[in-house]
Amino acid sequence: MRELKILVVNNYGQFCHLIHRTVRDLDMDTKIIPNVTPIEEILAEEPDGLILSGGPEMERAGLCFDYVREIDVPILGICLGHQAIALAYGGHVHAGKKGGYAEIEVEVLEEDDILRGLGPKTTVWASHADEVAILPDGFIHLARSDVCEIEAMRHPTKPIYGVQWHPEVSHTKKGEELLMNFFEVCDLY
């Protein structure tokens, strides 16, 4: 696979720099950008894909809602990024029953583009302080757990994906595989 340009949108989560380092270690050209970067500046970078990082609160998600609706490149939302995608397209997010980080067993419901090779079950590291409660209309439900019904989803027609868990941390089994699957989507788009 060629070297892709992947921009990591900083939503002020504690793992943002780890996402950046993991993407770089997978031989991609990457850069962290503030979540208030104007769309024109992002497009001028000519990215092959965007990763929306996790973060502490939706009120600090900057322009993420605009990014997922208006930028035509593959997008992967992680944790808060996943929730921002859901909200941008009319889904609902609520406080989870189990806050804090924990190891979770996720059931893969559909091994689509980004979850290929991860099923039928995989162990992940996730926080469920907030979680997607209702999928946006038409979105495909990709994974669930006993802690959270909507662990992963994708847009019905665009290459936009969300996962509640953190593929960038070592506690997540097959996290790098998920990222490489996302890069393949970016490469083919």
From Swiss-Prot:
It comes from the Archaea. One of its GO terms (molecular function) is ATP binding. Pathway: Purine metabolism; GMP biosynthesis; GMP from XMP (L-Gln route): step 1/1. Residues 5-189 form the Glutamine amidotransferase type-1 domain. SUPFAM superfamilies: Class I glutamine amidotransferase-like. The keyword Membrane does not apply. Keywords: ATP-binding, Glutamine amidotransferase, GMP biosynthesis, Ligase, Nucleotide-binding, Purine biosynthesis. GO terms for cellular component: cytosol. Pfam families: GATase. It catalyses: XMP + L-glutamine + ATP + H2O = GMP + L-glutamate + AMP + diphosphate + 2 H(+). The active site is at C79, H166, E168. It is an enzyme of class 6 (ligase). Catalyzes the synthesis of GMP from XMP. Heterodimer composed of a glutamine amidotransferase subunit (A) and a GMP-binding subunit (B). This is GMP synthase [glutamine-hydrolyzing] subunit A. It comes from Methanosarcina mazei (strain ATCC BAA-159 / DSM 3647 / Goe1 / Go1 / JCM 11833 / OCM 88) (Methanosarcina frisia).
